[in-house]
Regions:
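Bacterial Sec signal peptide processing site at the extreme N-terminus
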Residues: 28-54
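Terminal, low-structured helical/coil segments at or just beyond the last alpha-helical repeat
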Residues: 37-42, 222, 228, 232-293
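Alpha-helical segment of the N-proximal tetratricopeptide repeat
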Residues: 52-91, 95-102, 136
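Helix-start (N-cap) detector for alpha-helical repeat units in TPR-like alpha-solenoids
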Residues: 55-56, 90-91, 124-125, 140, ...
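Structural signature of tandem alpha-helical TPR/SEL1-like repeats
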Residues: 69-77, 102-115, 137-149, 171-183, ...
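Structural marker of alpha-solenoid helical repeat scaffolds
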Residues: 85, 119-120, 153, 187-188, ...
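Canonical tetratricopeptide repeat
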Residues: 95, 129, 163, 197-198, ...
């Protein structure tokens, strides 16, 4: 099996209509509800007099399966239908926001998350979803508003603390970011995601020895991921330790990709601190915003 040519991206294919309907069949069987003879996944209404329209719970299961499977168009349609049935429930609006954000419709996602918060002002998934959407639009100062409210209610939530750290890093407030990551590690010692983000923040501050000390035990562990190893390679590259960066790169990448990354690290070293921060954050902020909850 050949080596991978990259480690950051991960694509999830869309369901075909047939696969989506198969999921619906399974969910209906699990929920013990009557199944229409023909089901249109976009309208999710009974056809040919074969049964009553699905319930709110069934719609939420269908929409959730579509969202997980990457079938965002169906997820959006079904979450909207669920919101029509239970207009006071925040959950359909949160799911709708997640699906819209996944398609790049960030402004619509912001509206959806705010709709959820209008129904439950302390809903953590809605608060973090809204913060991630604001980060997507390059407005970390707005992201801090729902995150600060969430922190007051959940001060020991590691996922929330890491998202706060990412937001502070995007604002250029690296010391504050490191404080959040450090708090997160107190509640989740050895957490790889927190270690990666803390190490990157330390590197952005120019403290390469501390960054390496934080990340090296995680990246060199037997269970380490390619992302963790290549983040350590990036930090070595930023410090100018080309041999170490190349050695780590070759664990996961082919030679052409290693050479490409080494050239990129050299380019980063030649940038101003502000431009270097922007370049590094552009390849890490999306990961942080997408993957943390």
């Amino acid at each position: 099996m050949g080596k991978k040519s990259g480690v950051r991206g991960r694509c999830i294919g869309r369901f075909s209509t047939g696969r989506f309907l198969a999921v619906i069949l399974l969910l209906w069987a699990a929920g013990c509800e009557p199944l229409p003879f023909h089901l249109d996944p976009l309208s999710v209404n009974g056809r040919d007099g074969g049964g009553s329209p699905p319930s709110y719970g069934a719609l939420m299961r269908i929409a959730g399966a579509a969202l997980v499977g990457g079938d965002y168009a169906n997820a959006i349609a079904v979450f909207r239908r669920a919101a029509e049935i239970e207009p006071s429930a925040p959950a359909p609006f949160i799911g709708l926001g997640d699906a819209l954000r996944a398609t790049g419709a960030v402004d619509e996602a912001i509206l959806a998350y705010n709709s959820a918060l209008a129904r439950d002002g302390s809903n953590l998934p809605a608060q973090t979803g809204l913060a991630k959407a604001y980060l997507d639009t390059g407005r970390p100062e707005l992201a801090m508003v729902p995150l600060s409210k969430a922190l007051a209610a959940s001060p020991d939530n590691p996922r929330l603390l890491v998202l706060l750290g990412v937001t502070e890093d995007v604002e250029g407030q690296h010391r504050q970011a490191q404080a959040y990551y450090g708090r997160g590690l107190q509640y989740a010692p050895g957490d790889p995601a927190l270690a990666v983000d803390l190490a990157l923040s330390l590197a952005l501050s120019g403290d390469f020895p501390s960054a390496i000390a934080v990340l090296q035990p995680v990246a060199m562990a037997s269970a380490a991921s390619a992302q963790e190893r290549q983040t350590l390679a990036l930090i070595y590259g930023l410090q100018g330790r080309v041999a170490e960066a190349a050695r780590l790169g070759r664990i996961d990448l082919d030679e052409a990709s290693v050479e490409h990354n080494l050239a990129y690290y050299q380019t980063l070293r030649g940038l101003s601190p502000e431009a270097r921060d922007r370049a590094i954050l552009s390849i890490t902020a999306n990961r942080g915003a997408a993957g943390r909850s």
